[in-house]
Amino acid sequence: MTTTLSRPTDGEGSVQVQQDPSMKIEEGALVIAVYGKGGIGKSTTSSNLSAAFSKLGKRVLQIGCDPKHDSTFTLTHSMVPTVIDILEEVDFHSEELRPDDFVFTGYNGVKCVESGGPPAGTGCGGYVTGQTVKLLKEHHLLEDTDVVIFDVLGDVVCGGFAAPLQHANYCLIVTANDFDSIFAMNRIVQAIQAKAKNYKVRLGGVIANRSADTDQIDKFNERTGLRTMAHFKDVDAIRRSRLKKCTIFEMDDDDDAVKAVKNEYLRLAQNMLDNVEPLEAVSLKDREIFDLLGFD
């Protein structure tokens, strides 16, 4: 006798991480989850976008959701302790913690938190993200925040690391103009489609990064219903800002390329504040992407 396995709907099965209703982030805050292929520049993009929102006068909180805990170091100019490390120090008695123990103020007042994660091969990163949001709410740290940015590791869209999508209004996908990045982006679109059935998250658009051109991204956008919200070329000043452990907004204004990058981040931030029209994008099958991308 054969057994037919059916794909569970979102929220069914042990691999899914469900949001406690009490952990919902207050209405009014703009919550953005940033995803993309590993190494594509999500942390750089997230930190510079956080800085841009702060330049527009917004109160910003950035939450790094990667065990590497390197999301916010260009904002804080240091590698800050993670929530999971700090909780371990007090034997997970969160009531013993003060906000200053796990929230660090970075460039232009941006608040920074690194959730961290369990050791490799153990635990669930989504659980850690959930505990981070819980801790922030217990200390009423989300009530006076205008913008929350979740910077999520790699392109992992399992139940755990899809957890930030349960809190977000919009997902922004960082991609380059190449096959691997766009292939990963398609998987993220699939995750958004699944989460959007039960949560408020919607696709906000694409951020083209480290790419002189966007012809392949444009092809994918046209087929799926996505749009490019910002385009950052491979500017060496961005690489140097990481080495200097600072945001692009702290780099020399005399460089026209730096000015252009700053203006593009400010434009992106303002567009996100102006109530971006959510996208109803439709993902492609793997074979369709293979046939779509490339040159004739």
Curated annotation (Swiss-Prot):
GO terms for biological process: light-independent chlorophyll biosynthetic process; photosynthesis, dark reaction. Its EC number is 1.3.7.7. Binds 1 [4Fe-4S] cluster per dimer. Its cofactor is [4Fe-4S] cluster. InterPro entries: NifH/chlL_CS, NifH/frxC, P-loop_NTPase, Protochlorophyllide_ATP-bd. Gene3D superfamilies: P-loop containing nucleotide triphosphate hydrolases. It holds the Pfam family Fer4_NifH. Residues 1-20 are annotated as: Disordered. CDD domains: Bchl-like (cd02032). It comes from the Bacteria. Mg(2+) binds at residue 43. GO terms for molecular function: 4 iron, 4 sulfur cluster binding; ATP binding; metal ion binding; oxidoreductase activity, acting on iron-sulfur proteins as donors; oxidoreductase activity, acting on the CH-CH group of donors, iron-sulfur protein as acceptor. [4Fe-4S] cluster binds at residues 124, 158. Homodimer. Protochlorophyllide reductase is composed of three subunits; ChlL, ChlN and ChlB. Component of the dark-operative protochlorophyllide reductase (DPOR) that uses Mg-ATP and reduced ferredoxin to reduce ring D of protochlorophyllide (Pchlide) to form chlorophyllide a (Chlide). This reaction is light-independent. The L component serves as a unique electron donor to the NB-component of the complex, and binds Mg-ATP. Belongs to the NifH/BchL/ChlL family. This is Light-independent protochlorophyllide reductase iron-sulfur ATP-binding protein. It comes from Synechococcus sp. (strain CC9902). The gene is chlL.
